[in-house]
């Protein structure tokens, strides 16, 4: 039994709690109203090519198409011996073969320059009440010089995004969670770690690209009061896709996307390293779509058939001209051997074909700055017999 004093105290606490709750709700409603007022234009928001980003990290890209992302750590491939490199490559091939033709996987490698002042604040040695502050100042000076002259201040991040078709969100969640578990296991076997991203983290990544230098202040509860979507919090102030030929602007940033057009039969594993050594804001996107095994087999057999016909034509020409019919153009012989090897791998080892698109997006404050970055990207490609085009 409560005394009157205790009951009065309890009622006072309830009243105080109720007032605080109402005040908080009023504040959130006012904030939501302000967010609606400050939101980017609808046209700008609609330029972001996805439908919804859910709090658990599931993204609805298009009707019936869903994706999830994981952050991956570096794999010590370059410094490994050949046997270990071969083992990593085999496990990577197994990882890719784990996707079917209803899936798409994208590997993103992001170069982002840190603000030097912020970088020094985070890493410099702070003064302490001892006799070593002069040494700390000297170390900070050396660190700053290295940051300004090298790529120490570059933040390099790597992500894997995988996409699947599904009838609804729940089915997508079930299948993508299974895929996610396989991805995490695969990268663990390669000596890496894979950390699933929630919705907020994926929005923060998009925000860093679309609004460089800004900090995303966002909570999913905000959407209840503003009536907006996640598009409103990451969209830049504007998009201009008519800025210049092959270029567009996002807010105050000028951007351009290049694609890998020509490349040798085998691309050096140093290409990505050279690209990420460029001191600039860059994003590499490698989009990988598995081709249905039956369709892939027919494609290779058809290609092989065309080359065999070409071989027969070349032999017939040689015989008419009095040459040895077994002497064929080197590239034709090599292509036939490759087609035969590929067919054998597909039949015996269940290997599959992939449709791959290699993209690089560069950003700069001005067209002149972007020109310099684009030239560095193209130069990196030329060093490996690759051509990047607009």
Task: For the regions a language model picked out, list residue spans one by one.
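Extended, folded cores of ATP/NTP-driven motor/assembly subunits in large transport
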Residues: 1-390
């Amino acid at each position: 039994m409560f005394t009157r004093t205790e009951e009065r105290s309890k009622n006072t606490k309830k009243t105080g709690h109720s007032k605080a709750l109402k005040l908080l709700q009023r504040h959130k409603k006012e904030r939501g109203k302000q967010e609606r007022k400050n939101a980017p234009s609808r046209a700008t928001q609609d330029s972001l090519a996805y439908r919804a980003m859910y709090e658990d990290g599931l993204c609805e890209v298009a009707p019936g198409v869903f994706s999830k992302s994981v952050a991956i750590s570096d794999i010590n491939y370059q410094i490994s011996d050949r046997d270990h490199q071969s083992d990593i490559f085999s496990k990577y091939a197994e990882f890719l073969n784990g996707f079917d033709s209803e899936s798409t996987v994208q590997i993103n490698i992001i170069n982002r320059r840190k603000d030097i002042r912020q970088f020094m604040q985070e890493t410099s040695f702070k003064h302490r009440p001892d006799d070593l502050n002069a040494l700390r100042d000297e170390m900070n000076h050396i660190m700053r010089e290295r940051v300004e002259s090298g790529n120490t201040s570059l933040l390099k991040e790597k992500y894997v995004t995988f996409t699947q078709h599904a009838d609804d969100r729940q089915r997508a969640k079930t299948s993508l969670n299974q895929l996610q578990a396989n991805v995490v296991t695969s990268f663990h076997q390669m000596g890496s770690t894979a950390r699933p991203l929630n919705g907020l983290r994926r929005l923060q990544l998009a925000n860093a690209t679309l609004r460089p230098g800004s900090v995303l202040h966002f909570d999913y509860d905000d959407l209840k009061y503003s009536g907006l979507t996640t598009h409103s919090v990451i969209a830049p102030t504007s998009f201009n896709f008519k800025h210049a030929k092959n270029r567009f602007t996002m807010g105050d940033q000028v951007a351009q996307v290049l694609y890998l057009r020509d490349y040798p039969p085998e691309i050096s594993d140093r290409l990505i390293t050279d690209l990420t050594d460029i001191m600039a804001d860059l994003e590499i996107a490698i989009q990988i779509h598995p081709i249905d095994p039956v369709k892939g087999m027919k494609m290779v057999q058809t290609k092989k058939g065309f080359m065999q016909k070409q071989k027969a034509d070349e032999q017939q020409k040689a015989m008419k001209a009095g040459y040895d019919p077994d002497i064929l153009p080197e590239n034709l012989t090599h292509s036939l051997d490759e087609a035969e090897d590929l067919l054998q791998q597909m039949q015996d080892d269940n290997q599959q074909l992939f449709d791959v698109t290699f993209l690089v997006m560069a950003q700069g404050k001005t067209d002149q700055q972007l020109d310099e970055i684009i030239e560095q990207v193209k130069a990196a490609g030329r060093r490996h017999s690759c051509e990047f085009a607009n």
